[in-house]
């Protein structure tokens, strides 16, 4: 909105005790927009989208000529045996239509470094976004953040394993607390 854009929201709906995309609403609204920002996995709910859900969202975007930007910054923070599926891997057609945003800032506690990577489907899309970022004065990675990200991704596996155990303990504590003391809240 600060950049003169209009935000069109697709509210999640509860089905069978789980939150999901309201695909009928999504399809209606896809006719009105130019860009769809997907958070995969979802933040803050932690929904890990299935291949079928990702494909359906992507197919709707393709049918309506909507650019799909997939924010996959939380993709390493997955629990309970679920697996992150990168949106661009759902099909060959989708791979050529998705901009993927990735980063180790959440996973490796490097958020203050403002480091991320964007994967574009082609050079034309990248050049278009380079012009946009320049006009919006959006900051780029710096030498320190690039080295930190490289070190985190190359040497941070043990950190990630321990982090997931630690976070799972917190999840279990909250689940148990709510189950015993606030049963109206489903975790």
Kindly label every feature range from the protein language model:
Residues 81-85, 95:
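Substrate-gripping "pore-loop 1 plus following alpha2 helix"
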Residues 1-7:
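Substrate-binding/gating loop at the entrance of the active-site cleft, primarily
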Residues 97-180, 184-187:
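PLP-dependent aminotransferase class I/II
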Residues 12-82:
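Active-site phosphate-binding strand-loop segment of PLP-dependent enzymes
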Residues 5, 63-67, 95-96:
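A short helix->loop->beta-strand "cap" motif at the edges of active sites that frequently abuts
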Residues 8, 69, 99-101:
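Structural detector of well-ordered beta-strand residues that form the stable sheet scaffold
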């Amino acid at each position: 909105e600060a950049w003169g854009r209009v935000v069109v929201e697709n509210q999640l709906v509860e089905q069978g005790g789980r939150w999901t995309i309201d695909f009928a609403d999504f399809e209606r609204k896809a006719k009105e927009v130019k860009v769809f920002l997907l958070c995969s996995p979802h933040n803050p709910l932690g929904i890990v989208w299935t291949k079928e859900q990702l494909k359906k969202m992507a197919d709707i975007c393709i049918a309506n000529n909507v650019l799909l930007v997939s924010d996959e910054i939380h993709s390493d923070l997955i629990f309970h045996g679920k697996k992150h599926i990168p949106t661009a891997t759902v099909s060959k057609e989708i791979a050529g239509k998705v901009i993927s945003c990735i980063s180790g800032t959440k996973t490796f506690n490097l958020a203050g470094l403002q480091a991320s990577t964007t994967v574009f489907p082609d050079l034309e899309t990248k050049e278009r976004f380079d012009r946009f970022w320049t006009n919006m004065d959006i900051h780029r990675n710096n030498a320190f953040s690039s080295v930190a990200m490289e070190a985190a991704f190359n040497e941070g596996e043990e950190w990630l394993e321990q982090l997931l155990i630690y976070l799972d303990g917190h999840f279990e504590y909250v689940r148990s607390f709510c189950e015993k003391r606030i049963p109206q809240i489903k975790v």
